[in-house]
Amino acid sequence: MVAFHPLTVIDIRRETEEAVSILFSVPPALRDAYRFAPGQYLTLRTRIEGEELRRSYSICNELRVAVKTVPEGKFSHFANAHLAVGDTLDVMTPDGRFTAPIEPEKAKRYLMIAAGSGITPILSLAKTYLHAEPKSQVTLIYGNKSAASILFLEDLQGLKDTYPTRFSLIHILSRQPREVPLFNGRIDRE
C-alpha cells in the first residue's frame, strides 16, 4: 500500500553546483515497503514556510534521489541549501511503472537517452541491467550543459570501469565545445 512514512536523511552528496543527492535510512520494519524496482520514484513531503510541499523524484540507486535546484523551486532550493543529515522527511513508498523485466538469461542491447536530471531513473535501470543481465549491453547518450553539470559522473565512470565491454557512454554538451562536433548541442529529433 502506498503511504508516507518519516525517513531520516543519512547522506547528502553534492553532485554538481546545482544538485544534491539525498540518501534515506529505512527502519527494518519498513524495508519491504521501500523495496523498489529500477525506474520507480519517491514522493517527498515537508512543510516550508507553513506550506505543505510534495515533490516526486526518481530513485537513482539505494534509496537515493537527486534534487536539482530550479528557479522559484521552493523544495529544490530547500533541499540544496538547508536540508541536513539527520533531518526527517515524509517519504511515500516507491511508485511508478517506468520499469522493464530483468531477464538474466537473455542478451539484450539497451539504448538509453537522458538529459540533465533525467539521468536518475536511467542510472538505476542501467546499473541493474548491467549487474543482473551478464550478456546484455547498455549504450547511454547523456546530454548536459557542460562537464561540470553532469550528475553522477563518478557513478557513470564506475560503470564504464566495471563493464568496459558492455557499457558505452556518450556525453553530449550544449554549452561547452567539444573536439568532435557530433558531441556538441542538444539531444533532439535531428
Briefly describe each language-model feature range.
Residues 77-190:
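FNR/FR-type flavoprotein reductase catalytic core
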Residues 2-88, 92, 144-146, 157, ...:
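Ferredoxin-reductase
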